[in-house]
Structure formats: structure tokens, C-alpha cells
């Protein structure tokens, strides 16, 4: 399945929205190419969205386990509002074709730029309920996640 038309449409729509919110026509674009991959980065800066990005990475390679020809596409958008009380938005979709199989995944995250203790306690309690519903140990999962995603400068 060729996803180019879809990805190009998403990029165009996102950039139009970023420009409209920031009241600008300017888009910074960089494209990096190597034999197996292309990375396109688009950035809109302004007084509402300090930085809003949408980037696409394409990679054509061999699957490391099967040796099958593999095409990988990732589309990422990250939005950093100027107002620190508005959360950062991250959106990622990925599409891979390998060995005659197609895989599609995605995720979205909203990250508060200024942690509010009441909100963090509420979110933790709700996440604990979800973990318990599925028979998981919330504290063990939280500890595992904190070691995977911990940066020294956060200390």
C-alpha cells in the first residue's frame, strides 16, 4: 500500500493549521537524504505555537531478522505552545511493509509543561485503576517506565 498521498495530505493539513494559528506563512523545511532513508522536517514558529513540527522519515532496508525487503514510514508531529500552561502535543504514526505483511501503529501523548501536583495524583490514580483492571502491578510498571524514560538532567 502506497501511503505517500495520505502522508503528504496530513503534512499539508498540519502545516496549514500551524500557520493559521500563528498567523504566518513561513515554514522552515530541511530534508536529509542518505541512500536508504529520507528525513523531511517542517517547522512553524510563532507567538501562539512557539514551535510546531511535522516530520516524516522513510527507510528502505532489509529486515534484520528475516532479510526481507522492508519499507518503513514514520510521521511525527510535536507542538510546543508558547504558553507554559498549555501541554505539549506529540502525535506519531508508523507504517511498515515487510515480507508481504503490513503493520500500522500510532500514538498520541499530551505532556504538561508545568506539572500540577493535583493533576499528577489524579492521573496516577486513574492509571492505577487501568493497570488493576488488566491484572497488572501499577507500581512495578511505573518503576520500569521511570528507568526506561529517565534522563539524568531531570534529577
Residue ranges and their predicted role:
Residues 19, 30, 47, 51, ...:
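Context-gated lysine
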Residues 1-67:
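Gly/Pro-rich turn-and-neighbor structural signature
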Residues 98-155:
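Long, contiguous internal "core" modules enriched in hydrophobic/ aromatic residues
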Residues 14, 36-37, 52, 74, ...:
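A sequence-composition feature that detects small, non-aromatic residues
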Residues 13-14, 46, 87, 111, ...:
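Residue-level detector of solvent-exposed, low-hydrophobicity positions
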Residues 25-30, 35-40, 50-53, 71-73, ...:
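Generic structural motif recognizing short loop/turn segments at the entrances and edges of beta-strands
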Residues 56-123:
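Aromatic- and glycine-enriched beta-alpha-beta binding-site module
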